[in-house]
Amino acid sequence: GFAVAILYSALQLHVTNLSQLLTIDEAAVPGVMIVLAMLAFAAMTKSAQFPFCGWLLGAMVAPTPTSALLHSATMVKAGVYLLIRISPMMKGTLTGVLVTLIGGFTFFAASLMAIATSDGKRLLAHSTVSNLGLIVACAGVGLPESVWAGVMLIVFHAVSKSLMFLCVGAVENVTGSRNIEDMHGLIIKLPKLAIVMIIGICGMY
């Protein structure tokens, strides 16, 4: 989708710069909406929106530091960053409505799946997908307030989620399990780590 958007924009609109694309009047140049739709599609697949979230959940076999990078600050953030950049163009468009609906559904569905998960890393993965859905929904609205809300969610999610993944990895190294059912009494066994986890949880919400 991203490659198609670039090629179409270059060949039909003679624009290869995203900043220039954002200044084009979509009403005067119909082809802009095609580029916008393809960019939004590419961004949503990159940011693990339903139904393209399977790869992110499958990455749980990776070591914990790798999971922290994948889920908090690098790969998935590229997609939502692109959506935030093109968010003003999506305001009041069909593309924006679809992006908002898909983001909202992903947020709700991933939250429900997280409730039924006992694996600590997989639970955090569902939480990541859910948070990304909320950011995508904010980007689809296209209002300045929603864009700023999305930006703040990106920052808090990047910091807090990486902290949470590293904490779960530390618990797994000490206890030999990342099942949340085995984490009862953690405040007594590992008080400092438990406090850090609480800070990460508070940062998420």
Model-predicted segments: where are they?
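...captures the hydrophobic TM-helix bundle architecture rather than a specific catalytic motif
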Residues: 1-205
